[in-house]
A protein has these predicted regions:
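Short secondary-structure transition hinges
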Residues: 93-132
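Short coil/turn segments at alpha/beta junctions that flank glycine-rich nucleotide-binding fingerprints
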Residues: 28-32, 83, 143
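Amphipathic, non-transmembrane alpha-helical scaffold segments
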Residues: 11, 15, 65, 69, ...
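Hydrophobic alpha-helical bundle segments that form small-molecule/ligand-binding pockets
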Residues: 127-151
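Helix-turn-helix
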Residues: 17, 21, 25-59, 63
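A short secondary-structure junction motif
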Residues: 71, 100-104, 136, 140
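Hydrophobic alpha-helical connector segments
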Residues: 63, 74-103
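N-terminal intrinsically disordered/low-complexity leader segments
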Residues: 1-13
Length: 151
């Protein structure tokens, strides 16, 4: 029984490591340039192990982006909950985005269009993010930090 628990915790940790390694590689080289074999080699695991955990490259990309978005949102939420003003939180979101743009290979954004499941997720996430941003801006107006008549 102990062996099964260790195996499961190892697999869970490995799933996370795969997503981190894949996202770093995708952002650095572009999605099409990164092969599943590259990810497996980087983590010193077999391709078989990789394919036992994730069905294909699109699933790895999809899960990586979901994780990345969740972590970014958690970071901003934590920053906002630390008592920073609305303007400071907006600037932090801007800093995060600019850092991302600076670090990400432009091919990454072009390659995403070739993965329909991922493209759909990004569109849906963008809509939700925009709604949250507008609600946040409204909070800034209510606090008197932002002007209502500005678009």
């Amino acid at each position: 029984m102990q062996e099964i628990k260790e195996t499961n915790s190892y697999r869970l940790a490995l799933k996370d490591k795969i997503l981190d390694a894949a996202m770093n590689a995708f952002m650095k080289y572009g999605i099409r340039a990164v092969k599943m074999d590259d990810i497996a080699q980087q983590l010193t695991i077999s391709k078989r192990t990789l394919y036992e955990i994730y069905e294909d490259k699109e699933e790895v990309l999809y899960r990586s982006i979901i994780k990345y978005d969740r972590l970014r949102l958690e970071r901003l939420t934590k920053y906002a909950e630390e008592g920073h003003h609305v303007i400071d939180v907006i600037l932090e979101a801007y800093r995060i985005k600019m850092n991302e743009v600076r670090m990400v290979n432009p091919a990454f954004y072009e390659d995403i269009l070739k993965y329909p499941k991922v493209e759909t997720y990004i569109k849906e996430f963008s809509i939700k993010s925009k709604d949250k941003f507008l609600a946040f801006m409204q909070l800034g107006v209510e606090q008197g930090l932002l002007r209502k008549e500005v678009d």
